[in-house]
């Protein structure tokens, strides 16, 4: 729906749809919304708009006027505009619940007239006029309900009573287009353009109809189809003119047709009325008004009798009819006056309303009752001394009516009022039982997340933990009976972390046996629904009963049922034997049990014990069978020896220690003799297990004794550059020698500190008789020795700690 607005007057305050919601000649009615967010402003309004340009073009098109500037033509145009002004201005003068409420006065612009009223959804013309549009009839069907029509007629009578007896006006325009219906199904009188005041001290006056021109729009003259004959025939003005119009309107409401079809011609009207009188003389009133309810039918002659003195003397006399004595109608009347009543009267009314609700149409309950009751609830909650019974009863009615709404409508209309910061804390304390009783409806009508977080959890927390009122025990019992509903909403973590602690704490601390008994039932339900697991049951639930002191047979009987359900989630034999069976034996020996109760315990104990034994024996049988099958297969299966490669096995057993650096000593020089390492001859031989097989390689036998540093210095060597040559490049190395290790011990061979190339064959590595020969390319691992400070720079490649 498109909304538009301008910058001045009504259009600056309201935005409204680009197309009208409906039309009521001569006005187009738009649905508008205030731009301001003030709490006092209505959420929706109706904007009545008349297109002056379209009207003037219509007059020109049909030759009613020759030009817009002609003096005679201007008079005609202004007469029409004066009728429109009267319609809006008289609304401002007459204030009554059954007269259309004016919100913004008439604004005159160059292109249009407009004014703002309370929000209306339709007129009687659009709702009750007989049509072949089935969809339209279905959508408006609730407005045609008997009780709605009964009440609507009553509201029209009340409005006419005000206009006649208080304001001394004759309406003269009671017709379907002049009666509007608001969203609460209330009927509102409008069309006050022909309002005429009766002179003081008299009940009659004269009224002359203007000359009829069939070309002019209908709003410029009285609608003759709903005009009393004394005006047309005798020009007599009286309050009873409106009685006749009301009778014709009643006929329209129950038939969807006009009783007269005069085409707004006085001559046609006289013909139509003569036909009507002839029907009356040949047929009874009951036949002509057969569709009008029997209780109302006898009122018709007193409304539309040709003789004005045969009509009701006062419009209020019709209210004595049995038609208006219906309890439902009286209920609706009292509902309108409800804000003026005291709390005691309100409570009596609300209590009686509970029984009458099913007799009202759901649409009327939703549109009429619900807004009033929501407002009433907020008033009750805002009082300094809150009435528990008034709050509870009004909440109960609201939820019952809300159950007829869709979830979306309930969430939009009811939920915000109930869960407001001002109302919900009061409802928790003052209407606790009502909330509990209606949890199922709230669960269906409120979004799952909102219901869980904003209704269910606060309610459980308050009732099971915080409540200290006189009815706490009753509330706890009622709420605990709703555990199955709660488990449908709560997930496993919430049950474990929120609900179970509340129940456990309540079971431990409550002094009420019935509450304690109900807690046991809740635990049983949670086990049956598998809302808790075996660990939670064994660690949280079962320990509660170990410390329980009471041995009342009622709670012991409840516990027996719980114990019988425990194996549903606890299948561990050890837990059953260690925790469940001892509790059952303990409780079974209570002296408070009767013989039958004791027998129940013994049967349960024997059954659980038997089940445990059977299960355990089955486990043992499975184990023996498994062992037997394995042994049989081992006997019949041939032994397969896996072939292994000796070299692979030997390679896996080689252990070589890592090379370890030896730091140089401060102040040493290559001229000094390094301390001798242990002789390789004195070292432990290699572990034969770690020796690698040398299949396919020649064995290298080293028989020469190790060469000591002293013998090495005496051998003939060839120098590469002088050892004291200052120009020689010094190589700063942290380590210049290596220390050799084997897997069985550390062997360090130190070379002479001289920068020489040895020209003699290196001495072979010593070995002992028990040592294992190594294959070619293998030797004891090399380890670096730190050089001493002051030694000459010797390339690392020239000095070795051990020889291959």
From Swiss-Prot:
Gene Ontology cellular component annotations, sorted alphabetically: cytosol; mitochondrial matrix
Region span, Disordered: 666-804
Record-linked InterPro entries: ARM-like, ARM-type_fold, CIK-Related_Protein, Kinase-like_dom_sf, Prot_kinase_dom
Protein kinase domain sequence ranges: 1-324
Ranges annotated as biased composition (Polar residues): 667-685, 701-729, 744-759
Molecular-function GO terms, alphabetical: ATP binding; protein kinase activity
Compositional bias annotation for Low complexity: 760-776
Other notes: Present with 1480 molecules/cell in log phase SD medium.
Domain text: The protein kinase domain is predicted to be catalytically inactive.
UniProt name for this protein: Protein kinase-like protein SCY1
């Amino acid at each position: 729906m498109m909304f538009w607005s301008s910058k001045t007057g009504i259009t600056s305050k309201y935005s409204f749809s680009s197309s009208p919601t409906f039309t009521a000649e001569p006005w187009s009615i738009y649905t508008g919304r205030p731009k301001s967010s003030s709490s006092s402003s209505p959420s929706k309004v109706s904007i009545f708009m008349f297109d002056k340009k379209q009207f003037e073009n219509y007059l020109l098109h049909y030759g009613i006027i020759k030009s817009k500037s002609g003096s005679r033509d201007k008079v005609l145009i202004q007469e029409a505009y004066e009728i429109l002004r009267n319609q809006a201005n008289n609304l401002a003068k007459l204030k009554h619940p059954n007269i259309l409420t004016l919100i913004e006065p008439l604004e005159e612009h160059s292109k249009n007239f407009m004014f703002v009223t309370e929000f209306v959804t339709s007129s009687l013309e659009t709702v009750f006029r007989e049509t072949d549009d089935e969809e339209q009839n279905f959508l408006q069907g609730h407005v045609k309900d008997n009780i709605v029509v009964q009440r609507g007629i009553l509201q029209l009578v009340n409005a006419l009573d005000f206009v006649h007896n208080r304001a001394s006006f004759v309406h003269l325009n009671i017709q379907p287009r002049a009666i509007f219906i608001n969203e609460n199904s209330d009927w509102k009188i409008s069309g006050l353009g022909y309002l005429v005041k009766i002179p003081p001290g008299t009940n009659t006056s004269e009224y002359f109809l203007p000359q009829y021109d069939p070309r002019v729009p209908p709003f410029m003259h009285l609608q003759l189809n709903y005009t009393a004959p004394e005006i047309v025939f005798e020009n007599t003005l009286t309050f009873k003119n409106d009685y006749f119009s009301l009778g014709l309107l009643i006929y329209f409401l129950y038939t969807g047709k006009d009783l007269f079809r005069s085409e707004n011609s006085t001559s046609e009207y006289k013909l139509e009325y003569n036909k009507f009188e002839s029907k009356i003389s040949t047929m009874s009133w009951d036949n002509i008004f057969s569709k009008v309810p029997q209780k109302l039918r006898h009122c018709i002659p007193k409304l539309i009798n040709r003789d004005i003195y045969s009509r009701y003397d006062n419009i209020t006399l019709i209210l004595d009819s049995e038609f208006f004595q219906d309890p439902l109608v009286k209920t609706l009347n009292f509902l309108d006056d409800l804000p003026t009543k005291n709390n005691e009267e309100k409570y009596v009314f609300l209590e009686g309303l509970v029984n009458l609700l099913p007799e009202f149409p759901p649409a009327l309950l939703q549109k009429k009752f619900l807004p009033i009751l929501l407002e009433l609830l907020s008033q009750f909650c805002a009082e300094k001394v809150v009435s528990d019974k008034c709050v509870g009863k009004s909440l109960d009615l609201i939820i019952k009516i809300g159950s007829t709404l869709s979830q979306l409508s309930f969430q939009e209309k009811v939920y915000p009022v109930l869960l407001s910061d001002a109302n919900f804390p009061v409802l928790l304390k003052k209407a606790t039982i009502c909330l509990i009783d209606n949890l199922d409806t709230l669960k269906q009508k409120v979004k799952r997340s909102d219901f869980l977080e904003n209704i269910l959890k606060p309610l459980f927390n308050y009732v099971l933990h915080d409540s200290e009122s006189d009815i706490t025990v009753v509330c706890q019992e009622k709420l605990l009976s709703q555990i199955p509903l709660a488990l449908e909403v709560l997930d496993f973590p919430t049950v474990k972390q929120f609900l179970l602690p509340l129940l456990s704490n309540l079971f431990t601390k409550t002094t009420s046996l019935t509450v304690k008994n109900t807690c046991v039932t809740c635990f049983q339900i949670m086990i049956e629904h598998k809302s808790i697991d075996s660990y939670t049951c064994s660690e949280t639930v079962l320990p509660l009963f170990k410390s329980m002191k009471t041995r009342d047979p009622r709670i012991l009987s409840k516990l027996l049922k719980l114990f019988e359900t425990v194996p549903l989630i606890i299948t561990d034999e050890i837990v059953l034997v260690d925790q469940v069976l001892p509790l059952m034996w303990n409780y079974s020996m209570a002296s408070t049990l009767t013989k039958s109760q004791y027998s129940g315990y013994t049967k349960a104990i024997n059954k659980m014990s038997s089940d445990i034994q059977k299960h355990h024996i089955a486990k043992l049988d499975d184990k023996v069978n498994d062992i037997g099958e394995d042994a049989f297969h081992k006997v019949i299966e041939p032994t397969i020896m896996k072939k292994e490669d000796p070299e692979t096995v030997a390679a896996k057993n080689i252990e070589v220690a890592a090379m370890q650096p030896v730091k140089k000593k401060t102040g040493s020089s290559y001229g000094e003799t390094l301390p001798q390492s242990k002789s390789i001859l004195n070292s432990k031989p290699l572990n034969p297990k770690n020796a690698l097989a040398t299949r396919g390689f020649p064995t290298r036998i080293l028989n020469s004794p190790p060469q000591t540093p002293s013998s090495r210095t005496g051998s003939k060597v060839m120098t590469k550059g002088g050892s004291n040559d200052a120009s020689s490049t010094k190589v700063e190395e942290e380590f210049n020698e290596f220390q050799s290790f084997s897997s069985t011990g550390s062997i360090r061979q130190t070379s002479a500190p001289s920068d020489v190339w040895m020209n003699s064959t290196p001495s072979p590595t010593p070995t002992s008789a028990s040592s294992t020969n190594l294959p070619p390319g293998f030797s004891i691992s090399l380890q670096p020795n730190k050089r001493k400070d002051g030694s000459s720079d010797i390339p690392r490649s020239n000095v070795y700690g051990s020889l291959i």
